[in-house]
Amino acid sequence: TGNPPRQYSIPPKGATPLMDLRDFIDQGVWIISTIYNYLAYTGDYRILNEKTGYYDRVPGGVVLSKRVDSVLDHMIQVMDYLVTHIDENTGCLRAMYGDWNDALDGLGITHEKGKEYGDGVSVMATLQLYMNLREMKEILTKIDVHPELVALYSNKEEQIRQGIKKYAVVSNGTESRICHGWGEHRSYYVGTFNDVDGVNRYSSTSNAFYVISNMFKEGYVSKEDIVNVFKHLDSKYGIKTFEPYFKPDCKGVGRIVNLPKGTAENGATYIHGALFGTLALFMLNEGEMAYGQIEKLLPITHSILTTTPFVMPNSYSYNVEEDMDGQSMSDWYTGSANTLIKTLVKGSFGVFPSLDGLKIEIRDYFPSKSASLKV
């Protein structure tokens, strides 16, 4: 179906893995970007011909399928799934069960009988798909296959551009930003000047991927307004997921309301999300602010740590009322360290490999006289 599992276990040989089969819409977008980056760094196009299998979904789990396809076939399946879940009314990607911020799992809910999900949208995932469309076009063009898909993906790119411009850009007349998303039939929004709970709320990831995906080049929201979003989200431990947080009585947003203020995804510094914002700041040539974020996020700079001091944790909590100041839920999150490294390579050093070469962006600010990078 082109819908990968959210999580899976590595079972003993011959055994069936356990899988998290919830329909988070963003599962495939990371796969496309990962393979694109692998090709850009290595030039190893043979991987696209590698044969790999599938698991079929059955009640209560999965079973190994007899079907075997190439890696490229799998990528096309992923893209098919994603583009068929673009909401035709708005040109943006439906949220389904949710996106990277899995605590905000209410946008995809529907009240229509017979339907599992509605037409609520994740703007972050929409922008990730926008990036995937360009990546897949480059891959297919490079290996000279599927010109019909290249044309289709170009059409979908334009559909998303228009959808973002019309529905995801919000303004109060003096400033603009990219909203986080909306619920069924656009009956309520998140990350706007007047959210579902009546507050003016800033969201980090949608504004970050507006820049990372290069949608920023369309000029729908100014650099000054995007930087202003991150200034409002900044805190003692770095960029927060949201500001303000979601109170327990906030309707329609999902289980995030059950998280205490300033913890996990509910208005805390979640490392991945903060680094997405940091990369966006680097790409906007806001180097001094970006390095300030790096300093806040590194555990070695903290006076108090509740997890392993030399390992990137997943988040930092801050809630004065609950006596929380820098606590982390858990560490040994290799994804946090990985995202930090990618942010330094792309952001600090400006190194962006592509299928046709290497682009190096010269930054306006650097905090030291010299530094080196070996890839």
Regions found by a protein language model. Name each.
Residues 47-50, 145, 172, 356:
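Structured alpha-helical bundle/scaffold domains in large eukaryotic membrane-trafficking regulators
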Residues 1-92, 122-126, 130, 267-290, ...:
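Aromatic-rich carbohydrate-recognition surfaces in CAZymes
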Residues 87, 170-171, 354:
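Acidic surface patches and DE-rich sequence motifs
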Residues 2-24, 55-66, 92-118, 173-203, ...:
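Carbohydrate-binding/catalytic loop surfaces
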Residues 74-77, 221-228, 340, 361:
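Exposed alpha-helical structural elements
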Residues 6, 128-253, 295, 299-328:
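Catalytic cores of carbohydrate-active enzymes
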Residues 231-232, 263-265, 276-375:
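Non-catalytic C-terminal accessory modules of carbohydrate-active enzymes
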